[in-house]
Amino acid sequence: MAAVCFSLSRCCSAVHRPAVTAVRFAQTAAAPAAQPRIKKFQIYRWDPDTVGDKPRMQTYEIDLNTCGPMVLDALIKIKNEMDSTLTFRRSCREGICGSCAMNINGGNTLACLNKIDTNTSKVTKIYPLPHMYVVKDLVPDMSNFYAQYKSIEPYLKKKDESQQGKQQYLQSVEDRQKLDGLYECILCACCSTSCPSYWWNADKYLGPAVLMQAYRWMIDSRDDFTEDRLSKLQDPFSLYRCHTIMNCTRTCPKGLNPGKAIAEIKKMMVTYKQKDAVAA
């Protein structure tokens, strides 16, 4: 019993004994400064509202150590810290809105998804989307593109509108899957402005982006106006200026295939014309 009490007393005394903390002194020093990584960006500049202003390339230098990884990060840094007159479109910074579509190092893409080439010996060249009127600097005039999109009536159309807004228009899983690879288009116009046929016939040829959206509604099982949509593409230009160059598919920043969608419309058009001929 005495041994137990002695053991408990030792434990209690150990609990109340002040702790001894070893303090180690170390000399601190600032982290060594990172070597500057200066990257040159040549950016298309032009303000048509300024009398005498002519298109030119303007060079900016950025330390990549103080900039985000994407080309859009560099553009925002230039505008915020170097030249507030630089004009470009941007919004989501996540490849969702399509606002920052431009031509970077010769290819149409989204600035928010395009990584800066860290090779500082190479200059990054940035232009607006090709073969479109320029509003200012990197901002193209999208008016014609949006007018063409509006012309295909990109929305669900029903012949019987008596139940409109009263019930859901259901479709099978299989029918819904047919829309995959079509509805994801963000209308950035990268594909259309990479298409030589669209360059020369933009006033008549609808272009890859708009035609892919037309196809999206043609094959929607809930839509009742497929034949009407096909009938509007019978002229020699709206659809048939596509020569399967496939620049559209190669350049799409969302990985979609407008070229395939156009080919499917052409196949549907054959059946439609045959049916139309029989009816006549």
Swiss-Prot record:
Any Gene Ontology CC annotation: mitochondrial membrane
Listed GO MF terms: 2 iron, 2 sulfur cluster binding; 3 iron, 4 sulfur cluster binding; 4 iron, 4 sulfur cluster binding; electron transfer activity; metal ion binding; succinate dehydrogenase (quinone) activity; ubiquinone binding
Keyword ATP-binding among UniProt keywords: no
GO BP field: aerobic respiration; mitochondrial electron transport, succinate to ubiquinone; respiratory electron transport chain; tricarboxylic acid cycle
UniProt KW Iron keyword: yes
Pathway it works in: Carbohydrate metabolism; tricarboxylic acid cycle; fumarate from succinate (eukaryal route): step 1/1
Regions that span the bilayer: none
Location relative to the cell: Mitochondrion inner membrane
4Fe-4S ferredoxin-type domain residues: 175-205
Keywords assigned by UniProt, alphabetized: 2Fe-2S, 3Fe-4S, 4Fe-4S, Electron transport, Iron, Iron-sulfur, Membrane, Metal-binding, Mitochondrion, Mitochondrion inner membrane, Oxidoreductase, Transit peptide, Transport, Tricarboxylic acid cycle
InterPro entries: 2Fe-2S_ferredoxin-like_sf, 2Fe-2S_ferredoxin-type, 2Fe2S_fd_BS, 4Fe4S_Fe-S-bd, 4Fe4S_Fe_S_CS, Beta-grasp_dom_sf, Helical_ferredxn, SDH/FRD_Iron-Sulfur
Activity regulation note: Enol-oxaloacetate inhibits the succinate dehydrogenase activity.
Enzyme Commission (EC) number: 1.3.5.1, 1.1.5.-
Similarity annotation: Belongs to the succinate dehydrogenase/fumarate reductase iron-sulfur protein family.
Function: Iron-sulfur protein (IP) subunit of the succinate dehydrogenase complex (mitochondrial respiratory chain complex II), responsible for transferring electrons from succinate to ubiquinone (coenzyme Q). SDH also oxidizes malate to the non-canonical enol form of oxaloacetate, enol-oxaloacetate. Enol-oxaloacetate, which is a potent inhibitor of the succinate dehydrogenase activity, is further isomerized into keto-oxaloacetate.
Record protein name field: Succinate dehydrogenase [ubiquinone] iron-sulfur subunit, mitochondrial
Organism: Danio rerio
Gene: sdhb
